């Protein structure tokens, strides 16, 4: 998990430094729009409830959330057609990259992704070319430190969890099969654990450490270029950054 975590930290730091709040709001708004197709009431729509929780955590204004729901559910004639598309490819050094996009024009999105990959030493591949290198799983982040590890273990015995990872920030990441996200986070809440966030994630089964710093820098530039594309919703990679790497 070391390299995966480092990439997450780099993304978080970049987001804070660049203050790209508008882009974040737009991205989350699209998630809400797609989720709202299954119903505008979050009480009966877990996907929508999850997207709204993410929006609130990011500070998205209530008005933005309401408009995104209206677009997805067709309220007031505002329905917008967005589709979820997964793209797969390789970065420099054979690093696997999996991109999830929300798009109203798949030809445009594919062209933009193909250009970004080619400009930064990678290539966009066929569906399935790298997804087998990842596990699509449920992840729930809770408040838990080492002192509560035994209690957490006891709780997980009665839940559909595959395991957990304790962080050094007073939090733990509980993970399980893809289909149990709703029941897993509900079960943790019922056992009085403070749930911070929950999501579906592509977790790398193996990781790739580039053999030289220049390749690592190329990979990071590719990931940054992909993240800057409007249609890109999330990026997963099996890149592992060496501890000695200097940006």
Swiss-Prot record:
UniProt keyword Transcription, yes or no: yes
What are the entry keywords?
Answer: Cytoplasm, DNA-binding, Transcription, Transcription regulation
Q: Which GO terms describe its molecular function?
A: DNA binding
Where is it located?
A: Cytoplasm
SUPFAM superfamilies linked: YebC-like
One GO cellular component term of this record is: cytosol
| Entry similarity comment | Belongs to the TACO1 family.
Q: Name one GO biological process term.
A: regulation of DNA-templated transcription
Reading the lineage from the top rank, the first entry is Bacteria
Q: Where does the UniProt entry say this protein principally localizes?
A: cytoplasm
The record's listing under InterPro entries reads: Integrase-like_N, TACO1_YebC-like_2nd/3rd_dom, TACO1_YebC_N, Transcrip_reg_TACO1-like, Transcrip_reg_TACO1-like_dom3, YebC-like
Q: What is this protein called?
A: Probable transcriptional regulatory protein SynWH7803_1972
* Record-linked Gene3D superfamilies: 1.10.10.200, 3.30.70.980
Q: Which PANTHER family does this chain map to?
A: TRANSCRIPTIONAL REGULATORY PROTEIN YEBC-RELATED, TRANSLATIONAL ACTIVATOR OF CYTOCHROME C OXIDASE 1
């Amino acid at each position: 998990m070391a390299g995966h975590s480092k990439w997450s930290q780099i993304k978080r730091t970049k987001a804070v430094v660049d203050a790209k709040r508008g882009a974040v709001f737009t991205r989350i708004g699209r998630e809400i729009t797609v989720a709202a197709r299954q119903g505008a009431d979050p009480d009966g729509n877990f996907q929508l409830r999850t997207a709204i929780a993410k929006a609130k955590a990011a500070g998205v204004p209530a008005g933005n959330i309401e408009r995104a729901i209206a677009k997805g559910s067709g309220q007031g004639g505002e329905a917008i057609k967005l589709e979820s598309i997964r793209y797969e490819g390789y970065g420099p050094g054979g690093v696997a990259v999996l991109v999830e996009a929300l798009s109203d024009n798949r030809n445009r999105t594919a062209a933009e992704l193909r250009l970004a990959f080619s400009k930064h030493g990678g290539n966009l591949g066929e569906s399935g070319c790298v997804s087998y290198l990842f596990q699509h799983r449920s992840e729930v982040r809770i408040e838990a430190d080492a002192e509560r590890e035994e209690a957490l273990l006891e709780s997980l015995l009665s839940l559909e969890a595959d395991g957990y990872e304790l962080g050094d920030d007073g939090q733990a990441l509980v993970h399980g099969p893809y289909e149990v996200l709703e029941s897993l986070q509900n079960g943790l809440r019922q056992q009085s654990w403070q749930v911070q966030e929950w999501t579906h994630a592509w977790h790398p089964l193996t990781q790739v450490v580039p053999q030289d710093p220049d390749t690592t820098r190329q990979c990071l530039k590719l990931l940054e270029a992909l993240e800057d594309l409007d249609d890109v919703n999330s990026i997963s990679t099996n890149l592992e950054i060496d501890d000695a790497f200097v940006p």
